[in-house]
Amino acid sequence: MVKSPLKTEPNPQLDNVDCLILMLISMLAFIIRYWIIFHPNGCVFDEVYFGNFSNFYIQSQFYYDIHPPLAKVIAFVFANLSEYDGSINFNNAPVYPKPDYVWLRLVPATFSALCCPLSYLSVRFCGFSHTAATTCALLVIFDTSLGTEGRHILSDGILHFFAILHICVLMYTFSIKNYGLKFNVWHVLTGISLGAACSCKNTAWGLMPLDAYLYIVSFLPLIQRSYLDFFFQLFVYGITLFLVQLLVYIITFSIHFILLPFSGPGTPYLPDEMKRQLINNNQATSALWASRVRSPGLLYRTFSITLHMHR
């Protein structure tokens, strides 16, 4: 078990003051995100896209988007739980015909509100005071752009949640004093949270330099033993972090493809071999369903659609 001289303080312990502050911060965050969430009652900005994405999932029709699908899959799951039937036409909705849009807005609003207590915990795990952590959380709560994006049918609230969750897990991981089993478990959780963020939007890949910096600085004392130990540990932790992250990314796309078996508006963007795996609604025969499990597989489809996103 390797002990880093950079970690001279014990693991951060949350106290009763932290619990009280977290409750107050969470209440304030949810009040601001939920306040008059039904206004305006018409389509705002990119709700025209993300509202329709939920419709396509409900109708199982394949669609195309430049971003990975995790945030949209989560929105679809909660839309299903609210019994939304996918009937709102977001393409032409100056006024929404039914109040179901409120349930769709509550999903990103909830995830956006959870960013505030997570930001508090991230700062505390860095070793800062209650005052510093509270200040950080209040800045997140009252940030106009975060509050606005989090109140509408957009993927940004969910992206911000997983990004801050990753930072929180990362900070706690490096607060662990010894590189033992506990550190390795949280190292895997770090990769999972990073993969979840990257599976919402590709901009989250920008978190990787932060991870790299912290791992490099944390392992620097190993140079005193030997350069081989330093580079070996850095390689092992770096490659495992990337592989866990990549696995989450692939699983997310696999779920996306499984949920969308029918041909839809995104079909023309696919290569020919993937087009043949989609089923027409009026021709759902057993032979066509059999084509769904033939080559190419989910792994090929994941990387293929990822490349097509950026053409």
Predicted regions and their residues:
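Extracytoplasmic catalytic/substrate-binding loops of multi-pass membrane glycan-assembly enzymes
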Residues: 39-52, 62-77, 85-87, 102
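Transmembrane-lumen/periplasm boundary regions of multi-pass, lipid-linked membrane glycan transferases
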Residues: 7-10, 209-311
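Helix-to-loop transition at the C-terminal end of transmembrane segments
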Residues: 30-49, 250-268
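Start-transfer (signal-anchor) and selected internal transmembrane alpha helices
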Residues: 1-33, 114, 125, 235-246
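Short helix- or helix-capping micro-motifs
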Residues: 29, 133-141, 148, 194, ...
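Membrane-interface transmembrane helices that cradle and orient dolichyl/undecaprenyl
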Residues: 127, 166-186, 197, 216-222
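Short acidic/glycine- and proline-prone juxtamembrane loop motifs at membrane-interface regions
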Residues: 44-45, 145-159, 203
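Transmembrane-helix motifs of polytopic, lipid-linked glycan transferases
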Residues: 23, 102, 106-127, 165, ...
